[in-house]
Design a protein with these regions (language model features):
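Hydrophobic, regular-secondary-structure patches
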Residues: 28, 32-118, 137-139, 144, ...
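Transmembrane alpha-helical interface segments in multi-pass membrane proteins
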Residues: 279, 286-333
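Short beta-strand boundary microenvironments
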Residues: 115-157
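Short, membrane-interfacial amphipathic segments enriched in basic
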Residues: 1-7
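Mechanotransmission and gating elements of multispan inner-membrane complexes involved in transport
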Residues: 51, 87-90, 107-114, 140, ...
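Hydrophobic alpha-helical transmembrane segments of multi-pass inner-membrane transport and secretion
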Residues: 17-44, 252-288, 311-320
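Peri-membrane helix termini and adjoining interfacial loops of integral membrane proteins
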Residues: 3, 48-51, 326-334
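Short amphipathic alpha-helical coupling elements at transmembrane boundaries
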Residues: 7-15, 46-50, 294
Length: 334
């Protein structure tokens, strides 16, 4: 069977370039939305999973699910700190960081609208447990003072959070003495200060979470068994990487479902639009089809030519959509 040349098909698309552009644009929109949503979901998952350290263990009140919902009394924290399997630093101190975690509202620099920001009380041990966190501007806060350090994203995105500025929350003024970078993990969106000062300011008598480092990864099972065997503790014990992976799963799944739903809706519109376009193209080209038949091309060859036009339109739309989606890598979403 004699085939219609591809050059003929390409010229036809160019002659009808307005229709071609609109049809390919609809397909590009579908690909762009679907690819962008997948990128967002994967970005959230990767950011939160990278927040944890493989040797760290995170403890919450049993059933709390999240740090801001948890509460661990000082006595329980002291009991955990005395258990076997916990690593020590060069000075012999046990690597356990006892941290209160709360949410506050701060106005954004861009529009002044309030948004949630996580405030974490910690200490020098907390910084040692998280080697990816580095103070890149200013200095570390001093224990026992109303000094704070802000994550890179908070410092650039919220009013009053830049180096040298003052924030007011929990009925107290806090001076930003440093800005830290956590290598694109969730800590970039937090404010850190002295744990005891945070608890006093927010009037919280309990910690939200305990973060500790194991002296060896195999010690996790023994530590978990010891905590579960003591009915006074009532704590959930999880590897830090597992905790943040679980935290990301719900949001990432929601974004994927939302993106898939939008993509299906847009896909239906794009398919209907492409069908209408191709039917109209066929109806307008009855004479052309007759000429092709008169030149000796069979029905199958004509059908293949029209199908090739549709595939070429889809290919162009897909490439444009992916190219546009790849540009979203340069966009930071808060």
């Amino acid at each position: 069977m004699k085939a219609i040349p591809l050059s003929y098909i390409a010229r036809n698309l160019w002659v009808r370039r307005v229709t071609t552009l609109l049809t390919a644009g609809g397909m590009a929109l579908v690909v762009f939305v679907f690819a962008t949503v997948l990128m967002m979901g994967e970005g959230i998952r990767a950011t939160l999973v990278a927040t944890g350290q493989p040797d760290n263990v995170l403890l919450l009140r049993k059933g709390a699910g999240a740090e801001i919902n948890s509460g661990i009394e000082r006595a329980k924290a002291a009991m955990v700190e005395s258990l076997d399997g916990i690593a020590t630093d060069g000075e012999g101190r046990r690597l356990v960081s006892k941290e209160p975690v709360v949410l506050i509202n701060l106005p954004k620099r861009s529009n002044g609208k309030p948004s949630n920001v996580t405030v974490r009380g910690t200490s020098a041990l907390g910084l040692e447990l998280r080697p990816q966190v580095r103070v890149i501007e200013g200095r570390m806060f001093r224990p026992g003072t109303s000094e704070i350090i802000a994550g890179r994203s908070v410092a650039s995105g919220f009013r009053g959070a830049a180096l040298g500025e003052t924030l007011r929350f929990a009925q107290r003024d806090w001076v930003v003495v440093g800005v830290f970078d956590s290598d694109k993990t969730a800590f970039d969106s937090e404010i850190w200060g002295d744990a005891e000062q945070m608890m006093a300011a927010f009037r919280r008598p309990v910690y939200s979470t305990l973060v500790l480092r194991l002296n060896q990864r195999e010690a996790l099972a023994g530590l978990k068994a010891a905590i579960e065997a003591d009915p006074r503790l009532q704590l959930d014990v999880k590897p830090e990487t597992q905790f943040y992976a679980e935290q990301s799963e719900a949001l990432a799944t929601f974004i994927r479902i939302l993106g898939l739903s939008l993509s299906v809706i847009f896909s239906i519109g794009a398919i209907v639009g492409a069908m209408i376009t191709m039917f109209a193209a066929v109806a307008q080209r009855v004479g052309e089809i007759g000429t092709l038949r008169a030149l000796g091309f069979r029905r199958g060859a004509v059908l293949v030519a029209f199908l090739a036009e549709s595939l070429l339109l889809s290919l162009v739309g897909g490439v444009v959509g992916l190219a546009a989606a790849s540009g979203m890598q340069a966009v930071d979403i808060s």
